[in-house]
Design a protein with these regions (language model features):
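Histidine- and acidic-residue-rich, metal-dependent catalytic cores
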Residues: 46, 51-248
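Non-Sec secretion/translocation targeting segments of pathogen effectors
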Residues: 1-39
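DNA-contacting surface of Y-family translesion DNA polymerases
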Residues: 43
């Protein structure tokens, strides 16, 4: 069964009224989790600042994106390590749990290994976003928002030709894109709004909402789920994915 995203869902699908589990000691800063992805070779091959700098310098698209937005090339390894043991790991765990709670007919459409690798790499491009923007106290300006949005494509460009398969690359590139194509970056023929992209989008947003960051407090579990339920109403997240998230 192929999952269809572009059909209207408002007033047609009843989302189950689920008793949400109480939040469990979620302080907003995640301790490293020790499992097979904690030492993912996709990270270990990219932790050297000089190597990443050379990869970026040799990639015309990366240099074009940075230059056109007046961003100086500067590899922020500390941010990458923070993400590795925090938001990225949490997104990976959440995505895997969503997958496990899906109906079997939808599970068959997902490559779980690709999904988990994409979750661990989806914000990789933030290594090239200035720290003063990533960790700014307060709201970003319109210009800063545009620079922040570059991270999806920057991550894609950093990872391509480095042994990352096409499915993972596209999930990284389009993790902020929506089924109707109104997200970012601009879609091309490689955009595939499939069930995996929906799982990654939900897991990414849930993790971000639950974390305390420099510009916001952490939401409770119920608050975060309420925000994502609005995305379901607006056709941005598949209802089956939301139901799976709410059950974990």
């Amino acid at each position: 069964m192929n999952f269809v995203y572009n059909t209207p869902i408002l007033n047609k699908i009843n989302i189950p009224n689920i008793q949400f589990r109480a939040a469990e000691n979620y302080a907003g800063t995640l301790a490293p989790k020790k499992d097979s992805f904690s030492t993912n070779p996709l990270y270990d091959n990219f932790v050297d600042r000089n190597t990443l700098t050379q990869i970026a310098k040799s990639n015309p698209r990366i240099m074009e994106l940075l230059k056109s937005n007046q961003v100086r090339l500067d590899v922020n390894i500390r941010e990458l390590e923070k993400l590795k043991h925090g938001h990225l790991m949490d997104t990976r765990v959440t995505a895997a749990k969503i997958y496990s709670a899906l109906p079997q007919n939808l599970k068959s459409e997902v490559n779980l290994m690709d999904l988990q690798q994409a979750a661990m790499l989806h914000d990789y491009g933030k290594v090239l976003i200035p720290d003063k923007i990533l960790n700014k106290n307060g709201k970003l300006t319109d210009k800063e928002k545009e620079i922040m949005k570059l991270h999806s494509e920057l991550g894609y460009e950093l990872l391509k030709e480095q042994g990352v398969n096409e499915n993972v690359l596209n999930l990284v590139k389009y993790h902020h894109q929506t089924p109707d194509g109104n997200g970012y970056p601009e879609i091309t023929n490689d955009f595939k709004p499939d069930i995996s992209s929906q799982i990654l989008a939900a897991a990414d947003k849930y993790s971000a909402l639950r974390e305390k960051r420099s510009y916001k407090d952490a939401m409770t579990r119920d608050e975060a789920l309420a925000v994502i339920q609005e995305d379901v109403t607006n056709g941005l997240i598949a209802p089956e994915v939301y139901s799976a998230l709410a059950r974990i």
